[in-house]
Amino acid sequence: MQSLQVKILDERMRDQLPSYGTPGSAGLDLRACIDEAIEIVPGQTVLVPTGLAIYVEDPRYAAFILPRSGLGHKHGIVLGNLVGLIDSDYQGQLMVSTWNRGSNPFKLEPMERLAQLVVMPIQQVELKVVEEFTESSRGAGGFGSTGRT
């Protein structure tokens, strides 16, 4: 298993390190490192600290902060930036942009699992300017061009 460097910025997190919920989980659960409950009203976005910093280091990898499906489906709590991209050379605190897109206020409790962190391989590319593309079967068709079934 690949290792990931983590720095504990808030001592309360020492016993609350991100973990996988099940053996098959892809994401490590991130918690809200807050002193007291926060009420997030509909339409509001709040930046929530995790009390942790990571250093991926290897430029062949990046980390992604993703929403937890249950919070989004049941309560309308998603990420304000939809996906948080953590570059391999970033070393600051992980923050979760938390948006209540639902219709009811949501009470976020201290140390509540809020988002998940997924580490994935990344391929950097070199851009090659061309005048025309080699023709493909799809061409420039997009936004529903392949149908629904």
Swiss-Prot record:
The lineage of its organism: Bacteria, Pseudomonadati, Pseudomonadota, Betaproteobacteria, Burkholderiales. It comes from Polynucleobacter asymbioticus (strain DSM 18221 / CIP 109841 / QLW-P1DMWA-1). This is Deoxyuridine 5'-triphosphate nucleotidohydrolase. Its cofactor is Mg(2+). It holds the Pfam family dUTPase. Belongs to the dUTPase family. GO terms for molecular function: dUTP diphosphatase activity; magnesium ion binding. The gene is dut. It is an enzyme of class 3 (hydrolase). Pathway: Pyrimidine metabolism; dUMP biosynthesis; dUMP from dCTP (dUTP route): step 2/2. Substrate binds at residues 68-70, 81, 85-87, 95. SUPFAM superfamilies: dUTPase-like. This enzyme is involved in nucleotide metabolism: it produces dUMP, the immediate precursor of thymidine nucleotides and it decreases the intracellular concentration of dUTP so that uracil cannot be incorporated into DNA. Keywords: Hydrolase, Magnesium, Metal-binding, Nucleotide metabolism. It comes from the Bacteria. Its EC number is 3.6.1.23.
